[in-house]
Swiss-Prot record:
Family annotation (Pfam families): SAICAR_synt
Enzyme class: ligase
Upper classification of the organism: Bacteria, Bacillati, Cyanobacteriota, Cyanophyceae, Synechococcales
Database matches in Gene3D superfamilies: ATP-grasp fold, B domain, Phosphorylase Kinase, domain 1
NCBIfam families referenced in this protein's UniProt entry, alphabetically: purC
UniProt pathway annotation: Purine metabolism; IMP biosynthesis via de novo pathway; 5-amino-1-(5-phospho-D-ribosyl)imidazole-4-carboxamide from 5-amino-1-(5-phospho-D-ribosyl)imidazole-4-carboxylate: step 1/2
Protein name stated in the entry: Phosphoribosylaminoimidazole-succinocarboxamide synthase
Recorded catalytic activity of this chain's protein: 5-amino-1-(5-phospho-D-ribosyl)imidazole-4-carboxylate + L-aspartate + ATP = (2S)-2-[5-amino-1-(5-phospho-beta-D-ribosyl)imidazole-4-carboxamido]succinate + ADP + phosphate + 2 H(+)
Amino acid sequence: MNSKLKFIYEGKAKKIFAYEDSDKVIIEFKDDATAFNALKKAKFEGKGELNCLISSKIFEFLIKNNIPTHYIGLKNNNSMIAQKIKIIPLEVVLRNTAYGSLCKQTTIKPGTVLESPLIDFYLKNDTLNDPLLTKDRINLLKIVDEEELDFISNMTLKINKLLKKFFYNIKLDLVDFKLEFGYNSNGQIVLGDEISPDNCRLWDLNQKNGMIVSLDKDRFRNDLGGFIEAYSEINKRINNFI
C-alpha cells in the first residue's frame, strides 16, 4: 500500500484502507479462513485472491443488472476499490433450501427446497454471536426504518433471482447466502462486503448420485478437505462462463 492510504479496519477476512480526502477505500482480501465466529481459524495460500476475483466478477454482473453496490473495480488480484460506506449492522441471510441453522432451529429436514425464499435478519455483533432478529426488534433497535428494511428485503430478493440464474449457469445450486448493506456518501443504501464461497452456500449440480458436494466454506467448517480446490473450481467456472 502507498502513503496515500490509511489503514482503518481489519476483520476476519479483509483489511480496509482509506484514501485520503476521498470516499473510496481499498479492500484487501486475506488468506484467513474462519468459522464459528472465528473459534476455528486457518490460513490457505491464495484464498484472498480467489475471493477477491470471484467477488469482483459477481459485483460486475450485479451492477450490469442495476443492483447498486459499493464495488468500483479491481486494484490487483487480492484488492478491490470500493465506495466508503457506513455498514448497517444487519446480516441479511436468504435461504432457498433448508440447511444449517434453519434446520437446527426448526423441524425442517436438511435439503428441503423452500416453497419461496426465506429472508432472516441477524444483528451484526460477534460478542452476541449475531442473534436472529424479528422486524419488531429491528424497529426497537432503530437499525433501519420500515421503508429501508423493505428496500433491503426487495433488493435481496432481486439479487437472489439474479444469483440463482448466474450460479445455475455454472452448474451450482445457490442454497443460501449472506449479504451486508451500507449507506454511501449520498445516503443511498448499497450492497457491500463480498459475494464469494465464504458467504454463499453452493452445491455442485454436476453430481449425479444425489450426494451433496459443497463448493464453499462448509468444506473448511466441516473438515471436508479440498477447500482451496473448491474455491478454485468456482473461479474457473465463472471465468469459463463470462
